[in-house]
A protein has these predicted regions:
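N-terminal Rossmann-like NAD(P) cofactor-binding subdomain of oxidoreductases
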Residues: 1-97
Length: 97
């Protein structure tokens, strides 16, 4: 069974490392990555080490679709105020912020 995952706040170092691990995991499909500032731009514009491994583009948080597993890589303290919103998107959430 493939796990569909998304990363909220994927433009920083933590988001990039999460993406690298998930992209090479045989049981995970990295479905979406978010950045408000970079929405519409290629994910690899900020993580050139992953060129050739993904064609994902950044989407704003408002466009994130439900998934199986949601990773939060937001600046410290930002996730807590929006946990209800995130809980509606995935049954499992990992907060790395």
């Amino acid at each position: 069974m493939t796990i569909r995952a998304a990363i909220i706040g994927a433009s920083g170092y933590v988001g990039g490392e999460l993406a690298r691990l998930l992209l090479f995991h045989p049981d995970v499909e990295l479905a979406q990555v978010t950045s408000e500032r970079l929405a519409g731009k290629p994910f690899t514009s900020t993580h050139p080490n992953l060129r050739g491994h993904t064609a994902l583009q950044y989407v704003p948080m408002s466009k994130v679709e439900p998934c199986d597993l949601l990773f939060l890589a937001l600046p410290h303290g930002e996730a807590a105020s929006r946990i209800e919103q995130f809980a509606a998107l995935a049954p499992r959430i990992v907060d790395c912020s």
